[in-house]
Amino acid sequence: MSVYVDFDVPADLEDDALEALEVARDTGSVKKGTNETTKAVERGNAELVFVAEDVSPEEVVMHLPEIATEKEIPYVFVGTQDDIGHAAGLQVGSAAAAIVDAGEANGEVEDIAEKVEELQ
C-alpha cells in the first residue's frame, strides 16, 4: 500500500465510484489529471475525488487526500491509473480525477461520500 493511502476501499465501493465517474463524465463534468483535480479541490468545486494507488513517484498525488480533507471533500482510492483514465474517458491512465458536476450520478456520489466517510 502506498504511503498516501490512508484507508482501504472495498472492491464494490471502488466499482461504484468508477461507475459514477463514467456517468458524471457523460452527463455532468469531470476534471482529469493531478493538476486539474488539485485546482478543483482547492477551489472547492469537486464533489468527489479519485486518487490512484499505483502512482510513482507518490509525491505526485500525495497532497490530494490532505487538501480534500481540509476542504471537506470526499475522496476514494482506486487501484490503478488506468481504471481512472478509462472511467474518465481517456485513452491513457490518470493519477487523479474529480467529479465537479455529478449530473445524473448525483445520488450515487452522495451514497459513495457517506460510505467513504464511514471508512475514514
Curated annotation (Swiss-Prot):
Function: Multifunctional RNA-binding protein that recognizes the K-turn motif in ribosomal RNA, the RNA component of RNase P, box H/ACA, box C/D and box C'/D' sRNAs.
Organism listed in the record: Natronomonas pharaonis (strain ATCC 35678 / DSM 2160 / CIP 103997 / JCM 8858 / NBRC 14720 / NCIMB 2260 / Gabara)
GO cellular component, one term: cytoplasm
Top-level lineage group: Archaea
The name this protein goes by in its record: Large ribosomal subunit protein eL8
Lineage: Archaea, Methanobacteriati, Methanobacteriota, Stenosarchaea group, Halobacteria
GO molecular function terms listed in the Swiss-Prot or TrEMBL record: ribonuclease P activity; rRNA binding; structural constituent of ribosome
Gene that encodes the chain: rpl7ae
Keyword Nucleus: no
Subcellular location per the Swiss-Prot or TrEMBL entry: Cytoplasm
